[in-house]
Structures are given as structure tokens and as C-alpha cells.
Amino acid sequence: MFIVLLPAFLPAAAQWKWHNPMEASFPVIQNQGFTKEIGNSYTRLPERAKGVVSEPVWNLSQHSAGLAIHFYSNAPQIKVRYTVTGSLNMPHMPSTGVSGVDLYSINSDGEWHFCFGNYSFKDTITYTYNNIGKDRYHKQGFEYRLYLPLYNGVKWLEIGIPEDAKLEFIPVSPEKPIVLYGTSIAQGACASRPAMAWGTILQRSLDYPLINLGFSGNGKLAKEVLQFIGEMDARLYILDCMPNLPNQKEEDVTALAIAAVKQLREKHSAPILLIEHGGYSNMYMDSIKYNEITQVNRASRKAYEQIQSEGIKDVYYLSREDLNIPSDGWVDYVHPSDFGMKQQAIVVERKVREILHIPLGSLTTTIPVTQRREPHMYEWQARHRAFLEQVRNHPPKAVILGNSITHYWGGEPEHRNKNGRETWEKVMRPAGFQNLGCGWDRIENVLWRIYHGELDGYKAGKVVLMIGTNNCGLNNDKEIVEGLRFLLSAIRQRQPEASVKVIGILPRRNQEQWVRNINFDIKEMVETEGYEFANPGTALLLQDGKIDESLFIGDGLHPNNRGYELIAGEIASSNKSY
């Protein structure tokens, strides 16, 4: 009887399909660096570093700390299976931190959620994520971020989904990374799971690539390691090596820190953040430990002051007092718990936001966030990547930021929906406009895109902003106006010489009065802040104040080509001088 039944079980086992990131047609290992050399591996330094960096650093570079895999899937169940190169755990750090993985989902409104997986640590480690729900907007699932082990190497890894589900890997981010060079603490000791390492908490908060070059016991500001760091074009370099330098002479530590900054500055002008030793859990009860902390941080401070006195610009500093790791923030004498990791990440994030001019507001319209509300029409992240490539290869002299009204108007990147192609070609293209519109964007989504490079690396003569209608019904008028004010500040920071024009919210069916009222408030704010306001949408109204349905595609929101003809001239016209 068992012989008869056995084949009946085989199809169930075969109903899974497995995806190997190494077999993707493009690099998919995020937060890695040196992608052209090691993008088909789970390591952190290229092969040519072997014999150049110290043997311990080389061995530790084979650990996958900070690496991640991003993908889309609509699967109701996801499995991850893989093998590792070393021991599963350490006395002070569990298997879930040393050798585990972490999975987060991101829904269509950009909200992150931790996914708990049932795990099994055997020769092949497995994580199983069950009963996955559906997105509120569509049936194409979620974006996922899979974070890899902190203190182990990955031999091979596969992601499994039911055979009737879909999985699509996301290419490596083209954005400039933050590069973190540090010690065991930076590598992730002693987080309970990979995403709780402070560098990864920072990465998740900022949503920039962050390359983790933490090397346990070997974060010593070595010029050989800095040589490879200098090959990476980063938006910020963080040096957090003081915890591995307490046993060196004070003057030597000062010299090392100064030399490290100068070595990086020879190749790059990006900001550099120096971080002091965060302290020991027992430093107030152990006089030797207290003296170690005092000495190494005094040396670090001397280095920073010397750097400042020499006029080396864009070097920043965080002290032990700034970090303020609480007494319950350690697992042992020096390695933070999740509590300590979170504290350090919060403090560093606050400083990084100041350095990179990426503030957070208190309203939802002032907190940058991604979206994926209509993947059946386009992939938002893919369009963002296309924008970055477009402005890099063809620096525009004018840009228009907006939502679907802009997105489906015309221009590049190409899209099958073009509601006003003729008008775009007649008016906007001759005026030099690059279309930076994304369907279903809200104010906070445009803020994310600005923080992530769409206005960087070129000088535009004009910036036109046409956003806010999708915040209707979700935010009150004050939140919308303040969100626009916040957004305009971000635009001015990145395009200080451009003239900036804000287009009033276009009229929409059954909400014409609300549009009139809020445009009055928007106009007042815009002109007070010194920008130009235009309200071409009045041309889309009948004499009774209702929209002219013949000028829209049928939804009472998106203009057709005739509608665009009536508003394009005022949108594209030259702005007043700022």
C-alpha cells in the first residue's frame, strides 16, 4: 500500500520552483560594492584583495554581512534554503544572528513589515514564511528585502515559491552607497538577527545602499582596506574603527585617523563621518576599561580637531556622549544588543540626515516613502532607475516632477499610455523638458525620488512641480501645503540656480471647489517662499466652475490631448528669476 501511495506525494514535493540569485541575468546582490567583480558571489571584497589586506580581513570579507537580495513576489508562501561556510552560532550571539536571514515585505504604500519565518538550522538552513496576505491595491504581491547572515559565508542560496506564483529579482541599485568601515560592532555583533545590525537599521531607514565593511577585531583604519574603500564612489564614508584601537598609543591612533581621512580625501570629496568608541558596559566599574575608552576617544577627538584646523572640509564627528548607548545596550562588555544597535542607528541616522540634507518631517507628506500602486502599468522602482540613467546620460535643461498626469503625458522613458503625446512633442520637448512623473505618486513619493538622486548631478534651468492631487482624501489641506513647502526646500537644496514653478492642482470631477480652495492656500505659500505659482487648470473648467468633460480621457482627472493643449503653454513658459 505504501508503494502505491508514494507517487501521490511526489507531485506535492515538486510543486515548488526554486530561484537562485546567482542565475539571474543581471546582478542582484545589493549593498555589495565591486559588483562587476564579485556580483556573482556573497562576498564583500574582490579576489584581488587577497594578499593585499590582512588574512583576517580577507577571511572575514567572505561573510555576507549587510548583503541583501530584493525581489517581487505574489507567493502566498516563501521558502529560503541555503548552506553556510562556518559555525552556526557563537556563545554570545545566536544562530539567527550569526547564520540566519531576515525577510521584510514592502507594500504598495511603501510600508515595511517584518516577516517571521519558521527556521531550521541543519546542514541546509531553511526559513519558511507562511500565510502571506495580499496587497490592498493589486494581486501582484509585495516587494521583499532578504538580508543575509552577519557572521557566516553563504555557499549557495535559493528562494522557493509555489509553481503557480511569480518571483522577479530586482537589479542592484545604481545609487551611490554609504560605505561603513568598522569593527565587529559594524559587522553586526551581537544582533539577534541580520536586519538588527546598526548599519542595516540605518540602511533600512535611509533606503540607500549601505556597504558593510565591518571586520570583527580588524577594523583598524588599515590603509590597505582604505585603498579598496577609495575605489567606491560613495555619498558618505563612515569610519567606526575606534573599538579596535584602544590598545595602541594615543598619538598613533590620532595619526591613523588623520591618515585615513586624507587617504579618502585624495580621491573623493564626499562627506566623511568619524565615530568615537561607543563605550564599554562595565567602564564605570572597571577603571582599566574606563581609561581605555578615555584615551582612544581623546586620540580620536585630537585627530578631528587637527583635520578641522587643516581646513579639510566635510568631515563630521559623533562622540561617545552623542551615541549615548544605555547600560542595558550591550550583550557583553562591548558588543551591542538589539537595544544598543537601535540606539546607535538612531543617533547616526540623525547625523547623516543633517550631513546629506535629507530631513524628516513630522507629517506623512514630509516623510519620504516609495510606492508600487500600479505594477500592472509600470514598476515604480524601475522607472526611478530609468530616470537616474536618463539624467546622467542626457542632463536636462528643464524637468517636470509629477504623478500620472505628468507620467502619461509623453516623453521619455517611453510608456504605452500617452494621453497627450502630440502636445508633449509640440510644446514640452522643444522647451527641453525631462518627464519625471510617476503614476499614482503623492507628495511624499516625489520627496523620496528627490532624496534618491533624480535632481542630482546636473544643473537644470527650470524645475516644474505638479503634485498633490493624489493626497486628496488622505491628507488635510494643511498637510498638503506643508508637504509641498517641504518638497520645495528639497528641490532648492539640489537645484539652487533653477527657477522653480509650482502648478496648482488641476480640477477634478466633483471636487472643483476643493481644488479652488487649496490652490489659494498653495499659491499663498509658494509666493511667500519666493517661487512662482501658475494655475493653468482653470482652462479646463466650464463657466459654471465644473470640469469640461471633453478635455479629459473619461475619468474626470487626466486631461486628453485637447486638455493638455490648453495648459501646456503656461506650464512650459519661462519662470521668473528666483
Where do the language-model regions lie?
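Glycan-recognition and processing domains
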Residues: 15-62
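Serine-esterase "nucleophile elbow" of acetyl-processing enzymes
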Residues: 14, 92-94, 134-138, 142-216, ...
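Extended, charged alpha/beta regions that create polyanion-binding interfaces
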Residues: 58-170, 375-377
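Bacterial Sec-dependent N-terminal signal peptides
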Residues: 1-16
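Structural recognition of the beta-strand scaffold that forms the well-ordered cores
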Residues: 177-180, 209-213, 236-240, 271-276, ...
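Oxyanion-hole/transition-state-stabilizing segment in secreted/luminal serine hydrolases
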Residues: 194, 202, 219-258, 263-266, ...
